[in-house]
C-alpha cells in the first residue's frame, strides 16, 4: 500500500518527511503494451486561489484549490496514459503530490523536476498501470503556508468490481484561523474545531434507490488528521485499501478508520425497503459529527439481495513477502532536520541515500519516533505492507 499513518514525528511542524525518496530505493519503471497502444488522455489541472463556502450558510472562505479544467469526475481506465498539464496560479512554487501511483511518476516531482513557479506550467506523462483509487494534492511544499489547499480524487477502473453506482467521497478538514479563513497545516488553528467538506463542498445527502449496490471510494484528504467513519444500519464490506485489493472483510460496526491520505473502497447494499436512511458520522478522536446521509427513495432496483462481492483479481503484487533474507533498516525520526531527514523544499537527489539495496530484495523498515507529535509517512513510488510483531510477510 502506498501510504499509511505511522506514529512518526515531523522534522519540524511544517515539514513532511520524504528522506526515503531518491537513491534510497530504486523506483521501478512501469511499461505496458496496453498503455502504449492507446492515445494519451489529456488532463489539465490548475492550482489557484478561490473563495468557497465550506458549510451551509457560512460566508465564502479563501482557500487554495487544485481543480481540473474539465467538469465531471476524474475517472479513467487501467492502461490509460495521462498527458497531464499542471498550471500553477498560486503565488508560491508548487509540485503535485500523488498518492497511489507506481514508480517513477510518483517520484519525479522530487527527483527529476523543479517545482512549478508562480504563473508557470509543466506537462508530464502518467501511465495508469493499475486500477484503484488515487489522490493528488499540491501541498508537498506548502505546509504552514499562507492558505489551506484542497486535494483531488481520481479513479482508475477495470478492477472487476461490479456495482450499480460508483460514489467518491473525498473528505477534507479545514480549520478557521483568526480571520475566519482556513489555515494551512502547521499554522496555529487557535483551537478552532475543524470544518469537514465532501468533494470540496458542504456535505450533502447521497440519494439512492432501494436495493441498489453502491461502491464507495472513501478518501481522507486531510493532511494530518486520522478520521473514523461510521455508517449506521449498513453492512460495509471493504474491498481495497490505498488502491490495492484486499481480501474482502466486513467493517466492524460499519466503521472505517482512515489515516491521512488513506483510500478505502467499500461496498454497501441499500435495503430493499423504500425510505431507508443511513447516517454517516465522522470522528477525529475528539468529536463526532454527522457528515452525510445515504437516503433511498423510489422503486426498488431489486428485491432479492445480491451475493457478497468476490475478491478483486490480483493486481500483480505478491500475496506474501519472504522476509527471511530481508534487509532491515532502522530509521530514527526526530524534530531536528539533519542527515537522515530533509524537508521537501530542500530535497536534493544527489545527496547521500538513507540506505542502499539490490533490486528485488525485500526491505523491512523499522521506524522509531523520538518526538511528541505524529506525522504522515509517504514512501514515494513504492507500495509497502504494514507489519505487526507476529507478521512473517
What are the roles of these predicted feature ranges?
Residues 1-11, 22-24:
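N-terminal secretory signal peptides
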Residues 33-48, 144-176, 246-374, 381:
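Extended terminal and domain-junction accessory segments
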Residues 34-136, 144-145:
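Extracytoplasmic/lumenal soluble domains of exported proteins with redox or metal-associated functions
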Residues 57-75, 194-205, 338-359:
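N-terminal edge beta-strand
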Residues 79-80, 120, 128-134, 211-212, ...:
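Short tyrosine-centred short linear motifs in exposed loops/low-complexity segments
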Residues 86-90, 219-220, 367-371:
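Asparagine-centered strand-capping/turn motif at beta-strand->loop junctions
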Residues 93-99, 225-231, 375-379:
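Short, hydrophobic/aromatic beta-strand segments
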Residues 105-118, 127, 171-173, 178, ...:
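Histidine- and aromatic-rich segments of cupredoxin/plastocyanin-like copper-binding domains
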